């Protein structure tokens, strides 16, 4: 029976994907196998959309493979890290899910394998530690079994927090046209034109590597907490913003596409700084990119917090 919202053809594709999942090594298999199948099938469209969103940071438009950096973004944005189960442990699950293939990227079935594994070990962080030498104390720990831990992680963390592949389109339709965003960009058009000329080195298009180098030279790839607010920009986010803003990403950005790319990047970088409205996020990022302000200057101007600078 095809899951809700899935056509018979898509259902055939899903069954092919499901058969490729490597779950036999996870505790309790195969007792929960049908239940895990049903949980994944019920959320299939959302999980496909999330996978495409994080796998979108490559020029070939290859939203079919997720690399480790893209996976890191997913883990952080979906709030999967806990005190007892950090990113290093999760990246071990990335490697296990990818076992047997000769690449360092995850395809969709490997991504699903990894979600199931992470949900179990995240809910049972003691499990791996007590295996073997500590087996006699096993009963002291309460197992949180599958499929419950998977359902809970999806409904509480992954589905509400992770980006989907409509993210770029929603930005174009709802955030970009806001008067405050247009005013923030409009106030710096001349400086942006100069920036474009310099960074593109006079070419007809601004290339991805030129854009990444410009961000890197201003130290804008960072993960900071300032006055209690997370302020973060990663290379996959910057690439995704570039590709979403360019009509022909392989050629690069045209002059009128640069402001759009900057607005996207600004709203990603300052996404969690709630005292900044969208216009202020763009203004702040422009002052990072074109001026002398760093992230702390931008955030503290909004929060009124005390600077840590000498």
Role assignments for model-derived ranges:
Residues 1-310:
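Charged interaction scaffolds used for protein-protein
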